[in-house]
Amino acid sequence: MEAAKYGIGIVLDGVFSHTGSDSRYFNREGRYGEGGAYRDPNSPYRSWYDFDSKYKGGYRSWWGFETLPEVNEETPSYVEFITGEGGVIDTWLRRGAAGFRLDVADELPDEFIEKVRTAVKRVGPDKFLLGEVWEDATTKFGFDKRRTYLLGKGLDSVMNYPFKNAVLGFVCGRDAGQTMTDILSICEHYPAPAL
């Protein structure tokens, strides 16, 4: 990879909680012939999605956006497609990517994130897994349980929006003492490797 010659690592955005309605896997618009989960009840991708008339458009979608059908991250064939040997993670890391940023990591089950991590580290221990988590990743509660992003079996780090908010608040005139308190709180919560 050309970027590596200059000491630059490319981190890809892994959007694994949903696909586009126009993807070859869902194919709502028919761009890929008659195949795809939306058009073919016998599609190998059909089990990746939740089709039900109770949903707008007839399928579960990310935050109700019909162009973003949600996938079931617990479907074995989907998990294998993303994390298996020769899967998405394996392919792109072996082509030279430095790691992945997991889009909406706080909406992915911990078990799925752990499988993604295993796939990433299988390619190389230096490969990086970053997660989009909007709140304090050490105290996040979701899916009816405390999340385990930074306990050694999930993410290497997170986007750290609380830090961004503290810095932007200071730049926009927020009290320096409160900013310091916020930043020190983040440093106390997060394990050093995740900072």
Language-model-derived ranges and their functions:
Residues F112-I113:
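Residues at alpha-helix caps and immediate loop-helix transition turns in enzyme cores, especially N-
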Residues P76-Y78, R101-V104:
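Active-site rim elements
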Residues M1-R94, V116, R122, T139-K140, ...:
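Substrate-binding/active-site clefts of carbohydrate-active enzymes
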Residues G7-V11, G99-R101, D126-L130:
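Structural preference for beta-strand elements that scaffold enzyme active sites
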Residues S21-D22, N27-R28, E34, I89, ...:
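Conserved alpha/beta catalytic core and glycan-binding cleft of carbohydrate-active enzymes
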Residues W92, A98-R101, E107:
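Conserved, well-ordered alpha-helix/loop/beta-strand core segments that scaffold catalytic motifs
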Residues G14-S23, D103-P109, E132-A137:
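Short, solvent-exposed turn/loop segments enriched in Gly/Ser/Thr/Pro and often Arg
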Residues E85, P109, P191-A192:
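Residues that cap or delimit alpha-helices
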